[in-house]
Amino acid sequence: MKLNVSFPATGAQKTFEVMDDHKLRHFYDKRMGAEITADHLGDEWKGYVFKIAGGNDKQGFPMKQGVLTNTRVRLLLKKGHSCYRPRRTGERKRKSVRGCIVDQNLSALALIVVKKGEKDIPGLTDTTVPRRLGPKRASNIRKLYNLTKEDDVRQFVVKRPLPEKDGKKARTKAPKIQRLITPVVLQRKRHRLAIKKRRVESRKEAEAEYMKILHLRRRQERIRRRSRLSSMRDSRSSVGEERDKEKEKAAAKAAKKVAKKEAKKEVKKVTEAAKKADAKAKTKAEPKKAEKKAETGKKTAGDKKEKKVEKKAAPAVAKKEAPKRKPEAAKGDASAAKKEKKQKKK
């Protein structure tokens, strides 16, 4: 198994090939990120502490942190996941990765020196590999040279020498410092703040104007609602008055009808009482009339007999006189006579 050991203090890294399983078994069943002593690798590694950074199996599949197994699995990976670099935006792909637990099937194991031991390792701790580029951010440059905010960062930029050309001066290349505070940056900041302030003020004015219009509209709506309610109330009252008038008229008509009926009843009672009184008076006056009629009848009969006797005694020479009409009996007398006959029969 190959051990890729890196030393961040000098920036150097070196590969060591270890074939003895007795030396490697101390790494087995350890997970990525675990720290382990390197004393078992030999006396030159005494006091060194390693941190397991990763590795590859014999087929070249990388170890992935968080996959708690010592075998190979297929995971659906997307942008931001380790062991995968998307070729298109939003692309996802199922890739084979190895678990984060170390075993004997690995071909290479990446280790980081966390603590340096007693002895130097040749090619790892005794050599320094300078960085090709220096820090670019202003805060990192200040941190590297322990500068304050008042110091000018531009004088401490790490410059890179360019290859010399024939007959020309040596040139250097310096990176553009990012997050460097200059008068232009401060001016832009003031401009942004002024725009923001103006935007806030305009928003407040627009809000005040809107609230003013809203209060006006609400007031108009309240007035409109009140007028509508009052008109509805008036219409209801007018309708109620009409209904009351109609009811009063209907009640007056009903009272008139009742009064007429009562008057008719009283008239009927009076007429019936008068009829009864007339009938009683008639019943009392009927026998007197009958007696008078009987007397008058007797007189008329005697007169008729006398006239007959006179006719017989008259001479034949005498002129014939026109016959006199018999006096007709009064209708009341005839009816009285009929009533008497009926009473006699009874």
From Swiss-Prot:
GO terms for molecular function: structural constituent of ribosome. Keywords: Phosphoprotein, Ribonucleoprotein, Ribosomal protein. Disulfide bonds: none annotated. It comes from the Eukaryota. One of its GO terms (biological process) is translation. Residues 231-251, 260-331 have a biased composition (Basic and acidic residues). One of its GO terms (cellular component) is ribonucleoprotein complex. Ribosomal protein S6 is the major substrate of protein kinases in eukaryote ribosomes. SMART domains: Ribosomal_S6e (SM01405). Signal peptide: none annotated. Component of the 40S small ribosomal subunit. Plays an important role in controlling cell growth and proliferation through the selective translation of particular classes of mRNA. This is Small ribosomal subunit protein eS6. It comes from Aedes aegypti.
